[in-house]
């Protein structure tokens, strides 16, 4: 599964975009736990991804996901949840941001995430990228929010 995910990244990178596996899959990989939940973060927009993966089925209605910069792509029978690098603003329903702004910076995108251990990335060569020290927290068995804990949990109640 990891090999197909890295292949998926290479396709996006081949079109001149950055792309990384992020979150639970990378965390579980480091812990040597098998995972089937593959999240990708990229500076490619949903429309640019649709242009890249013209022969790939998008299981969700793109219009529903465009406002959050997320698409689901099935590639080689594996579901990839792909999200454009972004900043989020004001959560009004305790689940979804009222607006987002695409950014071209991985670190800015990672800083909007929930926990440091879920902000660890893997590049197309399998290298671990840990800009927010999530590996240290993982080693020390610490779950630490990236932002103010109260704000993080009230913004998104599913955290």
Identify the residue ranges that each predicted region occupies.
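Catalytic cores of the polymerase beta-like nucleotidyltransferase superfamily
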Residues: 1-159
């Amino acid at each position: 599964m990891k090999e197909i995910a890295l292949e998926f990244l290479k396709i996006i990178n081949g079109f001149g975009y950055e792309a990384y596996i992020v979150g639970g899959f990378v965390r579980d990989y480091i812990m040597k736990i098998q995972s089937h939940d593959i999240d990708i973060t990229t500076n490619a927009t949903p429309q640019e991804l649709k242009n890249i993966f013209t022969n790939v089925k998008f299981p969700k209605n793109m219009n529903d996901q465009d406002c959050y910069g997320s698409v689901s792509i099935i590639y080689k029978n594996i579901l990839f949840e792909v999200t454009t690098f972004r900043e989020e603003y004001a959560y009004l329903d305790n689940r979804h941001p009222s607006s987002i702004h695409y950014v071209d910076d991985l670190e800015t995108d990672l800083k909007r995430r929930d926990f440091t251990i879920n902000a660890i990335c893997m590049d197309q060569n399998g290298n671990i990228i840990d800009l927010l020290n999530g590996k240290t927290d993982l080693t020390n068995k610490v779950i630490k929010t990236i932002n103010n804990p109260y704000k993080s949990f009230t913004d998104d109640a599913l955290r």
